[in-house]
Design a protein with these regions (language model features):
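Mid-to-C-terminal alpha-helical segments outside catalytic/metal-binding sites
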Residues: 1-12, 20-105
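Active-site flanking residues adjacent to catalytic metal/cofactor-binding acidic residues
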Residues: 17
């Protein structure tokens, strides 16, 4: 969906970690966010990572900001593209699948 965000609209995309599935980003979420959103326009990335979900689920972002600042990656960190050579080899997360092949375990 990220690849097609200009067609379907970034306001219609929500990022998810797929936890607890094996293709999820657990342990490598910052890297997965960087792989997906690094180098993308900040307004689009923020919408797909944060504000779309907050609006859909009714989250109070002002109330959550102190927690996010404590445990989450910063917008500046997410904005840094992750070179495929840096993709974690220990992860089975689809974000690091350069072939975009669906896996079956």
């Amino acid at each position: 969906e990220l690849r097609d965000r200009e067609i379907i609209g970034a306001q219609r995309v929500l990022w998810g970690s797929d936890y607890p599935h094996s293709e999820g980003s657990l342990g490598f979420t910052t890297e997965a966010l960087r792989a997906a959103f690094g180098g993308k326009p900040e307004a689009q990335a923020r919408a797909m990572i944060e504000t779309n979900a907050a609006a859909f689920f009714g989250f109070d972002l002002d109330a959550l900001r102190p927690v996010a600042d404590l445990v989450g990656p910063s917008p500046d960190e997410v904005a840094q593209p992750l070179d495929p050579a840096e993709y974690p080899t220990a992860s089975t997360c689809n974000a690091f699948d350069t072939e975009q092949v669906m896996r079956s375990w």
